[in-house]
Amino acid sequence: MSTILQTTDSASQVYALEITCPLGLENVLEKELHGEGLTQTRLGEAQVKLTTDLEGMYKACLWSRVATRVMLPIANFKMESADDLYDGVKAIQWSDHMNASNTIAIDCHGTNHHIRNTQFGAVRAKDAIADYFVALSGERPSVEKEQPEVRIALRIKREVVTVSIDLSGESMHRRGYRQQGGMAPLKENLAAGLLLRAGWGTDCGLTQLIDPMCGSGTFLVEAAMMSLDMAPGLRRPYWGFKGWKQHDHRMWQQLMDFAKNRKKDPATLGIRFQGTDREQKAIAAARENIKRAGLTDVIDVTMSSFQEHEFDINPDAPGLLITNPPYGERIGDEMALIALYRQLGEWVVTHVRGWQFMMLTSNDHLARQIPVRPEKSTRVINGGIECRAYQFPLLAGSIKEDVVAQSVMTPGAQMFANRLQKNAKKLKKWVEKNKIQCYRVYDADMPEYSVAIDIYGNWAHVQEYQAPKSIDPEKAKQRLFEVMSAIPTALNISESNVILKQRQRQTGKEQYEKFDQTKHEMIVEEYGCEFIVNLKDYLDTGLFLDHRPVRKLIQDKANGVRFLNLFCYTATASVHAGQGGARSSLSVDMSNTYTEWARRNIELNEFSDRYHQVERADCIEWLKQSRDKFDLIFMDPPTFSNSKKMADILDIQRDHGELVRLAMARLARGGELIFSNNYRRFVLDEALEQEYDVKNITRETLDPDFDRNDKIHQCYIIKNK
């Protein structure tokens, strides 16, 4: 049997409302309601319960910036079977709330043993309401999912069902100024709640507001609406109570008229609202939203980074800086954002002392890059992601200099920085003497910091080795953050020039994995040769640094030779051969990507494609079919490959004997094969040493940046006896 919660005596009827809001902002909502004279409240989880009359109900709808929905519970009942749901809904006096001619929609939330999916629950409730009106008048309401005249909410919690009228009709974050679709920005009611939590509001005493990464401008618009005392519900074209039978149109219109008159004149406001964003789409959306909100003369937004933009700041007036920077969904994204968060912290400390500062982020590691300890934080949910809104004390005007100047590096990061500086110092003379631009400065020297760091000019390329399953992922993540925070200081490299990739065991096509479709290329030099490298788009960069001495050896041996480069990758060895005076070169690889890259490297160094050719082919099949002879052959096959382009699976330990013999068959009299591979447990087939003159030159092909790891590759010179 239904317990009826609301009746329809008169306009003086008292209603017990449930006003929902973003989790974590319940206190803010309650304070907001009290400010409108709605004081009979009780806090709940993600809601405030309000007892009020019809006018108070309208005020909550019209003036609440933080509320998500205003719900009017009309009945609750116990449900012990699916039939109980039907019976309980049908027992409600629906004629008190609507007519049979109204359109309805039913939202069902929650399930139990009897109602296992929400769609079934909504259908049973709809049938009950239809049957109620058929029995009463012979008519039934029709269903309208989008903007019905009466929206009904069904909440199932364990064995109890609560039935409510959704007076808001749809989420109250929809103010009417933001176009739906496209970008998925911060919701308006969450933005408003955070602004209120940060101390912003009508007549709050703050006269400047900046959002340095403003996106579609939600913080700016909501803040301006508060300062102008604009009712957030004033522009909404749709409300759920307009089809409700107890709606008083005259009272609502009077409250609307009062709200319009309450709005302040923007010309007398005296408050600056400024925003920047680097994305053209974001700024275009912000400008459109600002225009639709009628705030074009109040808010200034510019397409620019906050670092480069000159904000109009009054140093003697208090203000609020509030922003929702990117969080980084993937670990690589997070690492790239370290620089952005540091720059934000430094900019705030430098430019807006004495202000309030709030930052919303889901990533506490990134939050720690702000060089100030947060005073407090609020847990909220933004777009399904758990976040925290951090409030920083520097901005109260009493910040201590040692807090601002404190290093953002943890003891672990400082220890890692010390190791990097030690390694760099050890390599410095060798780098300068040989004019080395690209070299390895660190390779998992400390087991707990399992990364390889390569220098490419003024860039650092970081590869994280995949941690064993025994390592706590959070601990591994923390150590990686320490690595990334240490590199800029230790190696004197801009934070924005530190690139991270995650390395793991490669199989098949993953060896050629592309990260995105944008080319991020640069040109580097090595012993008179120029190479195109790409630090961002692929797992590898286009230049194997450990083979630097092998390439130099090829250059020294290449004068007048016919050179063959098998499994050529980007043909850097062929370029060295050309630089050394090779008569001709042929570079063979099965990858479309790398053969095209190889051609570009050869063209970059101005070698004629008539004499220095690139061919896409399965190297094993090519060797079986070729009858050409070469004076110098370089063969650096992968450890493993199962590409569909190959006739068979390649396993270098198992197959290297056949490969070497095929290559040796292509050697001219007196020629040499340089055979290398990167399999750390590689053992050369003893039969090859019986058949050929084999010399292990691995030690001679390790430069100082790789001499800590004699397993980085295995290299041999093989000649016919």
From Swiss-Prot:
The keyword Lyase does not apply. It catalyses: guanosine(2445) in 23S rRNA + S-adenosyl-L-methionine = N(2)-methylguanosine(2445) in 23S rRNA + S-adenosyl-L-homocysteine + H(+); guanosine(2069) in 23S rRNA + S-adenosyl-L-methionine = N(2)-methylguanosine(2069) in 23S rRNA + S-adenosyl-L-homocysteine + H(+). Keywords: Cytoplasm, Methyltransferase, RNA-binding, rRNA processing, S-adenosyl-L-methionine, Transferase. It is found in: Cytoplasm. Its main location: cytoplasm. One of its GO terms (molecular function) is 23S rRNA (guanine(2445)-N(2))-methyltransferase activity. SUPFAM superfamilies: S-adenosyl-L-methionine-dependent methyltransferases. Coiled coil: none annotated. Transmembrane segments: none annotated. Its EC number is 2.1.1.173, 2.1.1.264. PROSITE patterns: THUMP (PS51165). GO terms for cellular component: cytoplasm. It holds the Pfam family RlmL_1st. Residues 56-167 form the THUMP domain. Belongs to the methyltransferase superfamily. RlmKL family. Specifically methylates the guanine in position 2445 (m2G2445) and the guanine in position 2069 (m7G2069) of 23S rRNA. PANTHER family: RIBOSOMAL RNA LARGE SUBUNIT METHYLTRANSFERASE K/L, RIBOSOMAL RNA LARGE SUBUNIT METHYLTRANSFERASE K_L. This is Ribosomal RNA large subunit methyltransferase K/L.
